Amino acid sequence: NYKYLHYFFDHYRNRKLIKKDFPDEIWIENTNHCNAACVMCPRELQSRKKGIMDLDLYKKLIDEISLHKDVVKRLHMHNFGEPLLDKKLPLRIKYAKKKGIKHVYFVTNASLLTEKNSYDLINCGLDEFKISFYGVDKESYNNTMINLDFDKTLSNIINFFAIRKRLKSKQPKIILQLIPNSLTVNKVKEKWLNLFNKYIDHSIGDRFN
């Protein structure tokens, strides 16, 4: 999507580079497997072998990061894969929080946000996650997020909020990301608000936040 890429290019190209002894935001890719084939995603172009990060290697990285926990503002647990395909994700998050990492975060398509995963993510100390939900109805969603199902994912999201409310927890916070397709922004905004407004904590999209 040219408009989407152009927005990020404009956003980052004029930012001043600052040299630091240790980065304040860190990405750890726990897996590069994904169960979706979104039409705009370039992940299939990657030549790297697909897999899940070894737990001992992960702990070694977290141990090193924890030495700079006063500097690190956020740990991103994602990159080209779907983090929830890693069954040890809650364990990894719990370890990072135990080591004093301030803010642990990841991006998911929420198709695997089952009841068990919902409980585990709430109880492991996760601070926040973003849901990529590219569609405002069954047709637009299923045509964009190939291999996933609109009704199932929507049900997962609604059930997650019900579980979080039942546990009387305010964490993790949820951000919903929506990328409009051929629909106009106003129509997308109206449908999107009707669909999610009573559930989400924050949202980002195409010029409406």
What are these model-predicted stretches?
Residues 29, 51, 99, 119-209:
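Radical SAM enzyme [4Fe-4S]-AdoMet core and its adjacent flexible, acidic
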Residues 1-128, 143, 151-155:
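Conserved alpha-helical substructure of the radical SAM core
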